[in-house]
Amino acid sequence: MWGYIHLISWVAIVVLTITALLIYSKSTKSFTMLQMINRVFYILVILSGIMMVKYSIEQSWILAIFKILMGIIVIGVVEMLLSYRKQQKPTGMFLMIFVIVVVITISLGFYLSGGYPLFN
């Protein structure tokens, strides 16, 4: 169950982040609302991640710690990306970092979970 919550929350964070970036020029109010909803999903990701950490540590404790750090970095990069967008500063670098870090984090997550819940 926690795997599904974790996966759905990560997908929601990625979708909400991309939507917020695209919608900013049209509506700053909607942008702020999406940013707040994103933060609720951060809490879900952190809680579900805590509940699943014992299974990841059984697989490989070094990779589990690295995945935890990568997850924290993803949240930080999303926050920087959205705050830079709100301040109308260039976001290209953070967008590139966001894509790279998300791909690494997702890959580690599926490796540590043995593909669960998507490939099981």
Curated annotation (Swiss-Prot):
Q: Which family does it belong to?
A: Belongs to the UPF0344 family.
Alphabetized Pfam families for the sequence: DUF1516 (PF07457)
Q: Which UniProt keywords apply?
A: Cell membrane, Membrane, Transmembrane, Transmembrane helix
Q: What is the lineage of its organism?
A: Bacteria, Bacillati, Bacillota, Bacilli, Bacillales
Task: Write out the annotated subcellular location.
Answer: Cell membrane
Q: Which domain of life is it from?
A: Bacteria
Keyword field contains Transit peptide: no
Record protein name field: UPF0344 protein lmo2265
What topology does the record note for this protein and the membrane? Multi-pass membrane protein
The record, for InterPro entries, names: UPF0344
Gene Ontology cellular component list: plasma membrane
Protein species of origin: Listeria monocytogenes serovar 1/2a (strain ATCC BAA-679 / EGD-e)
- Where is the chain membrane-spanning? 3-23, 33-53, 62-82, 92-112
